[in-house]
Amino acid sequence: MIQTANDIFVLHTAHTTYAFRKLPTGQLEHLYYGRKIHVCEPLDENAVAPLIEKHTFQPGNSCVYDREHDAYTLEDLCLEMSSYGKGDIREPFVELIYEDGSFSSDFVYESSARFEGREARDAEDALPASYDEKNQVEHLCVTLKDNNSALKLELHYYIYEDCDVITRSAKLINDGENAVQIRRLMSCQVDFPTSDHVFTSFHGAWAREMRRWDVPVAAGKYVNASYTGTSSSRANPFVMLSGRETTEDTGDCYGFNLVYSGNHYEAVEVNSYGKTRFVSGINPQNFCWQLPAGESFEAPEAVMAYSKAGYNGMSQCMHRFVREHIVRGAWKKKVRPVLLNSWEAAYFDINEKKLLQLAKAGKEAGIELFVMDDGWFGHRDNDRSSLGDWKVNTKKLPNGLAGLCKKINDLGMDFGIWVEPEMVNVDSELYQAHPDWAMDIPGKNHSEGRNQRLLDLSRAEVQDYIIGQMSDLFSSANIAYVKWDMNRIVTDYYSKILPPERQGEVAHRYVLGLYRCMKELTERFPEILFEGCAAGGNRFDLGILSYFPQIWASDDTDALCRAEIQTGYSYGYPMSVVSAHVSSCPNHQTLRMTPLETRFQVAAFGICGYECNFCDLKKEDFDAVKAQIALYKEWRKVLQTGSFYRGRNFSDQGSTGSLSGPLTGNIQEWTCVSEDREKAVGFLMQKLVSPNTQFEYYRPNGLNPEARYHFYNRSLKYNVKEFGDLVNTVAPVHIRQDSVAHNLIAKFVKMDGEAEDFCAYGDALMYAGVKLKQAFGGTGYNEQIRHFPDFASRMYFMEQMND
């Protein structure tokens, strides 16, 4: 709901309120953002009096905005947006260079308008944005005018009441006769009157994405930013501001994200008066946009959520928003198939015979979608050639894509492929024909990544080529799934079609070109399931999710690492968009050995697939995989569409307000609850065994406290060899470890795992927790003992009882 009167603006969602007003000077003063509050009627200055700072004199050596209002200095105000040069020395919202070389801009209130629904976004160069299927979202547009020019600045607010989310964007319009340079135009600015916050960002690198870092803010500036040309595994655009005492389930928590896939910038700054400013938007470093007369520039949409129920509460807001108002198309509500990907089974060494053998094994195990990864086109036997040449290698696939696809379909599975459309190898027909299409600087050495260069997607003819090539490819066979990869960061930003003064536009124009390609292809092929990827999570953001309903979270498939990575993503993204695979051991990225069951359980809480050679699995492991897939299919609707909650996790802080580092905790807890709260799946994982600590508990979240649930675990059988020569404590004769006798016993004798099976009310499960059966402690074992070695995990199931 939006209340407006007397130049005061109050925006309400179901549980939050956001308020600002026009100052006597014309600037917009930010009044409040947080827990929902009542505002008196009529809406006037008296109604919001408790929220207004009372300024009667100029503080210290600060500068007054103008002599007529000498009590107002912009340096010490909470503002809705800030420009450069009029006394506010904090992070600006907008920064411009005028024709005369000056920097000072002076945006003041001109008008406002309210609308129902969202405007259509059909332009080819339009940025992606949130949407509402019922088109009932409320929209506020506030227009500011620049006292120094004929520029207008539109601030847009969209209210998603059901999600407790407000989105924001900005549009700069040049109604004058002279061009202006945009050095920065942020998407979001929120000023807080205090500085008692913790700033949380998610950092990492290839194969170790989304490591959570908490920094208590004090005087100064804290920046989370990407410089890679993508939203980046180094610094995801999702960030949080929370109270010093906030936990997973209690306390104030603000979440911020950006619907953008390029270089981004989030900054928290505390000024000398103890006020905190947050800004987010396109990274201003090396950004400079020439805005001619009569044109406009739009900033990406920013997403804001607040909850008084801690990190989990805020996450629920973000999860609902992404599921309902970002992800779209045919796959928005569809259950996703269980896939088998060929990459870690064969890498580049693929051929039709090998792929069909793998597919047949997959079909027997219950796989629904077979994906042929890299290596099928050109003369692509390694990563040094053929990107850009999307022609089938008929030596590897003599019957072409259509022939292989038909054989996969005849087995009863769908067929998918891997592509990397944005890239080109120097060793390719495309590069030889169009070297000018590659993004590099003429006459200067180019810094390559993974032996490849980027195509200049700021050029329309390059976009047309990609759209045409991919359209031909996707039409050539019954392709049901496409993995769209991007395996390097951007270097040497340069477009050969832009003049020198416009090279600061290249990074953003690249992203706009990418969006055009994705928009065209997803509209032409609406039934294809597209999965985004960028060397794992190097482009995991709301911009990509506006076109592709899921993203490969990380190239690291190690279960321990993935548990932390997926936990990191869960703060801002629902698990229904996180692609996760079960791989072989030793793991190909870490060489770590983890139990097959743990690998499955971690992957099951995302969009579950497999990435290992089923043909090489021992019968025992193959049978286990078959059982895993059957179980996942039974529960995947809950796992893919349910509400996800975190409990204890590997990144738990040692003390409140400390810097959160990687893997400091020992237990990971997750719960996923169906929308009707009738079913739930729990997960408990241990990093390392600690001796003589046999007792553990599991505490679910999100259940109906008044309902009675049947609680039980996934009970397993264990190979006797996991106990080593402890077998001699029960064997009538001595058995040498790994001997023929030991192996023979292991073939026929399995150790029963513990069973948890009882009924309890939801409140008892959530508030008291479940005290689990005793773990093995070195003094004996029976079917009531929990076998819980290093990296072990358990799945728990909760089903509401109707009697």
Name every feature range the model reports, one short phrase each:
Residues H15, A170, G294, L340, ...:
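Conserved, mostly hydrophobic/aromatic
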Residues L688-D803:
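C-terminal beta-sandwich/jelly-roll accessory domains of carbohydrate-active enzymes
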Residues K171, E177-V180, Y260, Y265, ...:
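Extended acidic/polar, glycine-enriched regions
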Residues F238-V239, E248, T656-P705:
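Carbohydrate-binding surface patches
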Residues W331-G468, Y481:
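Aromatic-lined carbohydrate-binding/catalytic grooves of carbohydrate-active enzymes
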Residues N425-D464, H508-D616:
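Glycan-recognition surfaces
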Residues D7-A14, Y18, L28-E269, Q285, ...:
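Polysaccharide-binding surfaces and accessory modules of carbohydrate-active proteins
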Residues E95-L96, S102-Y109, W289-K308, F791-E799:
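Short Pro-Gly-centered flexible turn/kink motifs
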